[in-house]
């Protein structure tokens, strides 16, 4: 897996490229998002969408889901082998919203998957352009991360709802490749592994035979991805133990849960990328912007600049607050669901409120919702500053692996100090340090106890004016430290259920 051993940049993972220099990376990422934009324009033409309808984020999501479904080979194969009533395995579709006589109407469309694959390839220079597909998956995943909390899923696997900040990418499909693996949080990887181990406990044949060999390879690969996210030797050594276990069972589950808890202080490194809805790239391409020539990066100023001058609309339910809907989408666009609200506040330049205080439900509209009362409004996706996205957990001192920030997985490389109650977390570590991982557990607990809340993460890193594209003058914000800014805490957000 790319996240292990070979240090490739995200953009290389994103575009499946081998080592390239910065210019080549910018060009290939540009080619990827340009292809998404061209595909989107073509789909709007096919569906005869007006300019306004093409800028509607719900239409963008339907079109994105259609192309993802058209290329989902395993599911397509499964659907053909297990025909279910009323499902045509060769077709895909979804709701398209059109403006008619001053009202929004829902129209369910159906398309041949073959036709969609043809359009996608044609707009991507004849390639399958899997990088572009993964990019769309990550955008959907970031939207889910900002919209739902995974309390129920956490509890089901024996983890604690307080670990919600470790769950980035928990709804990414398995087929999302190296770029997908890079953005998955520690909790997400732990959860996937625990589910696997539980299946092995319940199903005697899970690890046996030809299939079992493939399962085992997948298990070890997932262990290596998770190991690569940890930044301390003791955590990595524990992952080796879990990976090498002859017959993974409850002991391994215990170890994994212990590691997930430890990641609340000794943060894992998780990538963050600004993946935007297809319609945003479409708008830019339609406006004559040449992504490949100009180059593009998912972790720099480019997405901020793109959002600065794109007008995107969203359907709004009768009792929703348009400003809150905008915040939700802004957070999704910058993969900032687990960022400290104080940092997001500063960058966005308007007040960012915690999930529980948002008067908005998810972006997608269910098929049984009444369209009569739907309105639409412009999403405010602009920002006051921009900042570089990070892939580190924000630990202040890599040698000592000191404190990261609890309930927060930093998105932006911006200096902040780390308000956390060590007592609260250490309480989760009473007792069990025996067994074959005892020395590693003891070492991890020792490191956590020596973590100092007054430490500063991302020392000297700041935000930049939008005119400062070369990032020459960092503005280091000073934050009011009285409160910790987690988005999900004290919260009653909806659950994400597949």
UniProtKB/Swiss-Prot annotation:
Residues 1-21 are annotated as: Disordered. Signal peptide: none annotated. Late in virus-infected cells, may be cleaved from a 56-kDa protein to a 53-kDa protein by a cellular caspase. This cleavage might be a marker for the onset of apoptosis in infected cells or have a specific function in virus host interaction. It is found in: Virion; Host nucleus. Transmembrane segments: none annotated. It comes from the Viruses. A motif (Bipartite nuclear localization signal) lies at residues 198-216. Keywords: Capsid protein, Helical capsid protein, Host nucleus, Host-virus interaction, Ribonucleoprotein, RNA-binding, Viral nucleoprotein, Viral penetration into host nucleus, Virion, Virus entry into host cell. Its main location: virion. A motif (Unconventional nuclear localization signal) lies at residues 1-18. One of its GO terms (biological process) is viral penetration into host nucleus. InterPro entries: Flu_NP. Homomultimerizes to form the nucleocapsid. May bind host exportin-1/XPO1. Binds to viral genomic RNA. Protein-RNA contacts are mediated by a combination of electrostatic interactions between positively charged residues and the phosphate backbone and planar interactions between aromatic side chains and bases. HAMAP family: INFV_NCAP (MF_04070). Belongs to the influenza viruses nucleoprotein family. Encapsidates the negative strand viral RNA, protecting it from nucleases. The encapsidated genomic RNA is termed the ribonucleoprotein (RNP) and serves as template for transcription and replication. The RNP needs to be localized in the host nucleus to start an infectious cycle, but is too large to diffuse through the nuclear pore complex. NP comprises at least 2 nuclear localization signals that are responsible for the active RNP import into the nucleus through cellular importin alpha/beta pathway. This is Nucleoprotein. It comes from Influenza A virus (strain A/Shearwater/Australia/1972 H6N5). The lineage of its organism: Viruses, Riboviria, Orthornavirae, Negarnaviricota, Polyploviricotina. The gene is NP.
